[in-house]
């Protein structure tokens, strides 16, 4: 009888411990919470919570209590259908509790923090190939829609470059022509 009671108590205590552990984990979103202590006596710390989508990619980053009025700063990362970074949003303020912020609230908060701009995000366009190389990157704000940074992937052509010291056969050298917002090209 004593052994049976001991086993029942053990099973009940394990059940209670598992329930306590489950109550500490968010049931709606996956996240990793990080604390960085800023003083040796652990009196001050910075806390950051990174929420992940269903595929394990970071979707929201919450810097807890980082604004002057002790509110959270939340950043959003959106992905396209192929898992590439599509839009990186400017941060928005939230209530200050480190919780996940709904997408619509975050988008309107980022827009209001950016002075009402309708494009408070950086947007990247990729080429339609399995290499997933970016071809254009539009800066934050409506003013930069017509002035993207563009990337052109080129191979060596005997007519396009003069090579003084190197003998490279045509088509063997891959380079990138980056055109900035003002239309100035730079070759890499």
List each model region and its residues:
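Positively charged n-region of N-terminal signal peptides that target proteins for export
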Residues: 1-8
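Acidic, low-complexity segments
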Residues: 8-10, 22-188
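Short, linear, compositionally biased motifs with a strong N-terminal bias
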Residues: 14-15
């Amino acid at each position: 009888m004593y052994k049976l009671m001991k086993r029942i108590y053990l099973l009940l205590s394990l059940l209670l411990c598992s329930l306590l552990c489950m109550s500490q984990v968010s049931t709606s979103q996956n996240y990793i919470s990080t604390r960085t202590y800023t003083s040796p006596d652990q009196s001050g710390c910075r806390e950051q919570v990174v929420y992940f989508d269903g595929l394990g990619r970071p979707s929201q980053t919450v810097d807890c209590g980082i604004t002057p009025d002790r509110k959270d700063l939340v950043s959003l990362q959106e992905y396209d259908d192929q898992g590439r970074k599509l839009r990186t949003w400017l941060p928005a303020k939230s209530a200050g509790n480190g919780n996940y912020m709904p997408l619509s609230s975050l988008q309107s908060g980022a827009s209001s923090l950016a002075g009402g701009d309708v494009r408070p995000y950086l947007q990247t366009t990729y080429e339609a190939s399995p290499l997933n190389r970016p071809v254009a990157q539009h800066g934050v704000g409506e003013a930069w829609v017509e002035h993207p940074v563009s990337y052109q992937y080129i191979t060596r052509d005997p007519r396009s470059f003069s090579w003084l010291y190197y003998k490279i056969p045509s088509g063997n050298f891959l380079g990138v022509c980056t055109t900035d917002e003002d239309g100035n090209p730079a070759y890499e």
